[in-house]
Design a protein with these regions (language model features):
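Glycine-rich loop-to-alpha-helix module at the N-terminal edge of alpha/beta enzyme cores
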Residues: 1-54
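Acidic, glycine-rich active-site loops and adjacent beta-strand->loop/helix elements
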Residues: 8, 37-38, 63-67, 154-157, ...
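Short, conserved catalytic or adaptor-binding loops enriched in Gly and charged residues
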Residues: 22-23, 83-90, 167-170
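Short acidic, glycine/serine/threonine-rich loops at helix termini
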Residues: 43-46, 70-75, 126-127, 158-163
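PLP-dependent aminotransferase-class I/II
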Residues: 64-121, 125-131, 143
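Catalytic PLP-binding core of fold-type I/II PLP enzymes
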Residues: 109, 127-161
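Active-site PLP attachment segment
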Residues: 162, 168-186
C-alpha cells in the first residue's frame, strides 16, 4: 500500500509515532511513510526546501555523519571519501565540525534552510551529540529561521533509553526521520 491510500494499521502507527515523538502528547504532526532511511532523509530535505522557498535550499550537516546513499543524502553525509566515486554531487550542502556550534554557525550562509544531524553518529564512530549541542542547534535554528532535522534512523524508537535521542536534550525538532527500528528488521 502506498502513501496514496490510508489503511487502518498505517493510521494507528502514525498516531503512535506522533504521540511518541511528543513524549506522550500528540504533536498533531504529519507522518509520511517511506521505504528506507535514505528516502526518509531525502523527503525531509525536500520538505525543508519547499517550506523555506526559493533560495534557501542549503543544508548544513556534520563531518563524519551518514544520512543515506541517494545523491542528496550522500551529499549531506560528511564523509568526503564516500563522495568521490559519485561526483559531482548536488550543490547546497555544507559540513561543520561535530559538537561545535561555532563551526555550524560559520557554515550557515544566506542559502541555508536547514540543519541535519544525528543525535548520535553511528557510522562516524558512535559520537554522542550531547544535550548542550542539540539545545544550541535548536536555538541557532530559531535565531536564523532554519529548520532543525533530526536523523533518528539509528537512534529512534527506544535505542538510547528514550523513545528518541533528542528527548535527552529536551528539544523539539522541526522534522524527525525514523527507520530501522520501526521495521524491527523486516
Amino acid at each position: 500500500v502506498s502513501n496514496l491510500f490510508i489503511t487502518e494499521p498505517q493510521l494507528e502507527v502514525a498516531e503512535t509515532l506522533d504521540r511518541l515523538i511528543g513524549k506522550g502528547n500528540s504533536q498533531s504532526g504529519k507522518i509520511l511513510f517511506q521505504n528506507s532511511g535514505a528516502e526518509a532523509n531525502e523527503a525531509a530535505m525536500k520538505l525543508a526546501r519547499k517550506y523555506q522557498g526559493l533560495g534557501k535550499h542549503g543544508v548544513v550537516s556534520a563531518y563524519k555523519s551518514f544520512h543515506g546513499r541517494t545523491l542528496a543524502t550522500l551529499a549531506a553525509t560528511g564523509q568526503p571519501e564516500k563522495h568521490e566515486p559519485f561526483a559531482p554531487l548536488p550543490e547546497g550542502f555544507r559540513h561543520a565540525e561535530w559538537n561545535n556550534l561555532d563551526s555550524f554557525e560559520e557554515a550557515i550562509d544566506q542559502t541555508t534552510g536547514a540543519i541535519l544531524v544525528e543525535p548520535i553518529q553511528g557510522e562516524g564512530g558512535v559520537n554522542d551529540a550531547g544535550s548542550d549541542f542539540l539545545q544550541g542547534l535548536r536555538k541557532l535554528c530559531d535565531e536564523k529561521g532554519l529548520l532543525l532535522i533530526l536523523d533518528e534512523i539509528q537512534t529512534g524508537l527506544g535505542r538510547t533509553g528514550e523513545w528518541f535521542g533528542f528527548h535527552h536534550a529536551g528539544i523539539k525538532p522541526d522534522i524527525v526521520t525514523v527507520a530501522k527500528g520501526i521495521a524491527n528488521g523486516v
